[in-house]
């Protein structure tokens, strides 16, 4: 089905009466489906529809900005959230410990990995490091060569290793989605952690956000300008300087 609304209706109608125990998908789009299912059933939480639901395997976008919204529609204490890292180019990682947000790198799936330091991505001849050469807590752009024919292909994501035995990592952003206009090196991971803290302080639920640098002129210092779309908030903190 090419029409999104028709697809949502079909999925909702076919799954509401079924014993669903697990979900898999992109957090933003799955949330749209969940809300439609709750609308159609008149239920307040998803476990009222699917009492045996216990896990959501998610990927595609960061889950952090959506976590609070999921808590609003799924109250079950047995619900688990497992991050996966897959793309059309391959399957690269999965969270193997619910107490650790890092993902285990899939090293036996016919993929040869190389890693380019984020600060070298735009250079003409960046240095690519093999897996055993990576450093912990450093941002790298991931480069892959696969048995399917991809050769030193930069997939556009940035990762940071948290362990080398075994190799575990977190996704920190995209090679093109960062701001470094003034040497600040703001990446998606930093931004989303900051937004999550702001949400916790204000009770806000965020839908989307965007940020851009504003350069210094005779009237103001260099800075960032943020546009944040919020579903709701319970209170706002007083402006602090």
Model regions and ranges:
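Active-site glycine/GP-rich loop and adjacent strand/helix microenvironment
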Residues: 1-237
């Amino acid at each position: 089905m090419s029409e999104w609304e028709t697809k949502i209706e079909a999925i909702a109608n076919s799954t509401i009466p079924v014993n669903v125990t697990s979900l898999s998908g992109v957090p933003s789009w799955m949330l749209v489906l969940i809300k439609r299912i709750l609308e159609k059933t008149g239920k307040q939480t998803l476990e009222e529809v699917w009492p045996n639901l216990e896990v959501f395997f998610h990927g595609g976008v960061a889950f952090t900005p959506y976590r609070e919204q999921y808590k609003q529609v799924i109250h079950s204490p047995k619900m688990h959230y497992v991050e996966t890292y897959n793309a059309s180019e391959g399957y690269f990682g999965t969270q193997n410990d619910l107490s650790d947000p890092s993902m285990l790198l899939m090293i036996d799936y016919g993929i040869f990995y190389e890693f380019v330091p984020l600060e070298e991505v735009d250079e003409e001849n960046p240095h690519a490091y093999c897996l055993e050469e990576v450093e912990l807590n450093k941002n790298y752009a991931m480069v892959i060569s696969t048995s399917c024919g991809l050769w030193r292909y930069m997939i556009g994501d940035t990762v940071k290793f948290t362990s080398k035995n075994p190799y575990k990592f977190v996704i920190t952003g995209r090679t093109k989605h960062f701001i470094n206009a003034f040497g600040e090196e703001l990446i998606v991971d930093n931004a989303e952690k900051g937004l999550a803290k702001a949400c916790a302080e204000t009770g806000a639920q965020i839908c989307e956000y965007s940020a851009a640098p504003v350069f210094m002129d005779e009237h103001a210092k260099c800075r960032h300008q943020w546009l944040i779309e919020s579903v709701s908030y319970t209170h706002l903190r007083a402006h602090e300087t």
